[in-house]
Amino acid sequence: MKNKILKGSIIAFIFIICLMFITSGVSAETGSNNDTTIQTLSKGGLSITYPSTWGYSEATSNYSIMAISKLDSIDAAGVGQVNVNFEKQPLTTDFNTFINNTYKQMQYDSSFKLVSSGQSVIAGKPAFEYIYTSNDNGIEREHKAVWFEKGGQAYVIMYSAPLDQFESNLYVFDYIISDIQIT
């Protein structure tokens, strides 16, 4: 009888030790993932949330309200190679004509290739979505732009990345679009 109790105690002890190792391993893994927090940025009538692995960056457009970039992609000039740019332009015509004219002008660039276009919704507002590629200083880039109208202004939220980084970072853009607040 003592032999069975001893064997049972040893098995229980080993089981408890194994559980402790498994638990500490899981805690270590989740600890490294918890380093990313959610940031908020509000400007120009838009409020967004994004992961802390991205940050505010310089934009190259005159119409830019704000821009965020993946932190490890920001160059010496402060411009991110993987970025989301938020722009606002006054409408000089109706919204549909404005969008069509914008993409007609872009077609004069021989590197511009429209991948897809269609209707979408952003924060409950009707929107247009365009996905296209272009060549910027020898770097092939893919872009996803979502356009909407508010108060006589055309807004565009555009994600841009080198082709080899586009898909792997697209989830951040999709998260921003799904959570954006238009004020």
What are the residue ranges of the model-derived segments?
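Conserved polar/disulfide-associated segments of primarily extracytoplasmic proteins
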Residues: A59-V156
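N-terminal targeting sequences that direct proteins away from the cytosol to non-cytosolic compartments
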Residues: K2-G78, G118-S120, D136-E140, K150-G151, ...
